[in-house]
Amino acid sequence: MRNRNLLKFLPGLLICLIVLTSCVPKQKNMPYALTQRSIPQILPLPSEAKQPKPPKECSPTCSEILQQKLSFMLKLLTNATSQE
């Protein structure tokens, strides 16, 4: 019975994860020596920093809505497993 309840949420969780990963900017393939972690950076002051523009296919409200849905589904899964 519990497995059936959990399986109901699985497709929705997978879809949300796929959409969320499409919102994350993809890193270009670079040699290991040239990755951003190996290159020291001087960060600007917060007042000088420019905010990156969100990708066209994913607005800020899109990720907020998905985060709310994932949080709700996680609560349901937690409640379903804690009841048994």
From Swiss-Prot:
Membrane topology of the entry: Lipid-anchor
Lipid attachment points (S-diacylglycerol cysteine): 23
Segment forming the signal sequence: 1-22
UniProt keyword Iron present: no
Record GO cellular component, one term: plasma membrane
Main location group: membrane
Keywords of the record: Cell membrane, Lipoprotein, Membrane, Palmitate, Signal
Lipidation (N-palmitoyl cysteine): 23
Keyword Methyltransferase on entry: no
Domain of life, source organism: Bacteria
Entry's localization field: Cell membrane
Note: Entirely encoded within the coding gene for rzpQ (AC P76158), on the same strand within another reading frame.
Protein known as: Putative lipoprotein RzoQ
Native source species: Escherichia coli (strain K12)
